[in-house]
Amino acid sequence: MDIALDLQSIAVQEKTLVFPQFDAARAWALGSQLRELALARGHAVAIDVRTFGQPLFFALLDGATPDNVDWARRKGNVVAHFRRSSYAVGLRMQQAGATLADKHGLPVAEYASHGGAFPLAVAGAGVIGSVTVSGLPQRGDHELVVEALCAQLGHAYETLALARS
């Protein structure tokens, strides 16, 4: 995996995957899409879609654990703090040889800079929430979210997917 290449790709994903508007119905559709993708692939994951401060969709699939719920919360907190995907933040920390606690004073019990949380951005409004998956390796969590966002927004996933490692 090439960190610099992944960071470039994630920046394009974040710029492209923007909703014209977002509401509870759209959150439910996105969460349901993620659930169907995960079920079809046999993934044991937690799925969380929220605007900041308001949960709109949550699912815990068979085999997922309370640990996945906590990881999803902590990854979502990273999006809320940085307005970037948790994977991008984690890769930046890896590049810097630092942690969120070291560099930003953010407690590990509340923030996880691992892939899987992605900003929900609305044109003209900016980042208003996050969509998070937890239960796969971090790159897989991130890519599952991107795949569902592409489907919801009418983008070809193949054009926005991270390069295969």
From Swiss-Prot:
It comes from Burkholderia thailandensis (strain ATCC 700388 / DSM 13276 / CCUG 48851 / CIP 106301 / E264). It holds the Pfam family HbpS-like. This is UPF0303 protein BTH_I2506. InterPro entries: PduO/GlcC-like, PduO/GlcC-like_sf, YBR137W-like. Gene3D superfamilies: Haem-degrading domain (3.30.450.150). Belongs to the UPF0303 family.
